[in-house]
């Protein structure tokens, strides 16, 4: 029995050393891969934060543009008035005249100031919205 234990002890020690090495190796590889996964996660989070900051800047610029539009429409209308230009729309004639009224040969009518202001505001808001949307798309595609 003593002879058997003498032959068995080196094998048991070799098995324990192998198991210890395996365990330490797997722990170090796990730590290495966990670190790589963590680094990749940090890179993605930083990229997402950077993209969000860029989108926030686009949004802030869009909000500033919208705030500036109110004075802009008034300025455009006053510039048109100072140049003696008018905003006009085409109108369809409704029928023949009985000869008692004036005749407008080009079939156009002048817009009311409030309507002109509203139309200009809508078009300028639409332009600002499209520019902001295009800037947002550019920032998201830069990713």
From Swiss-Prot:
GO terms for biological process: proteolysis; viral release from host cell by cytolysis. It comes from the Viruses. Residues 1-7 are cytoplasmic. It is a single-pass type II membrane protein. Keywords: Cytolysis, Host cell inner membrane, Host cell lysis by virus, Host cell membrane, Host membrane, Hydrolase, Membrane, Protease, Signal-anchor, Transmembrane, Transmembrane helix, Viral release from host cell. One of its GO terms (molecular function) is peptidase activity. Residues 25-143 are periplasmic. Pfam families: Phage_lysis (PF03245). It is found in: Host cell inner membrane. The chain crosses the membrane at residues 8-24. GO terms for cellular component: host cell plasma membrane; membrane. Its main location: host cell. Component of the spanin complex that disrupts the host outer membrane and participates in cell lysis during virus exit. The spanin complex conducts the final step in host lysis by disrupting the outer membrane after holin and endolysin action have permeabilized the inner membrane and degraded the host peptidoglycans. Host outer membrane disruption is possibly due to local fusion between the inner and outer membrane performed by the spanin complex. Interacts (via C-terminus) with the spanin outer lipoprotein subunit (o-spanin) (via C-terminus). Part of the spanin complex which spans the entire periplasmic space. The spanin complex is composed of spanin inner membrane subunit and spanin outer membrane subunit. Belongs to the T7likevirus i-spanin family. This is Spanin, inner membrane subunit. It comes from Escherichia phage T7.
């Amino acid at each position: 029995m003593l002879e058997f234990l003498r032959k068995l002890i080196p094998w048991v020690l070799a098995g324990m050393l192998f198991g210890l090495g395996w365990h330490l190796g797997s722990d170090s590889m796990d730590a290495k891969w966990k670190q790589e996964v963590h680094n990749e996660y940090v890179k993605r989070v930083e990229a997402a934060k950077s993209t969000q900051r860029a989108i926030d800047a686009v949004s802030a610029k869009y909000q500033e543009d919208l705030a500036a539009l109110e004075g802009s429409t008034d300025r455009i209308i006053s510039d048109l008035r100072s140049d003696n230009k008018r905003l006009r729309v085409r109108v369809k004639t409704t029928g023949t005249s009985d000869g008692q009224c004036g005749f407008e040969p080009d079939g156009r009518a002048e817009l009311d100031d409030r309507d002109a202001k509203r139309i200009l505001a809508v078009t300028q808001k639409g332009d600002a919205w499209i520019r902001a949307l295009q800037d947002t798309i550019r920032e998201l595609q830069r990713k």
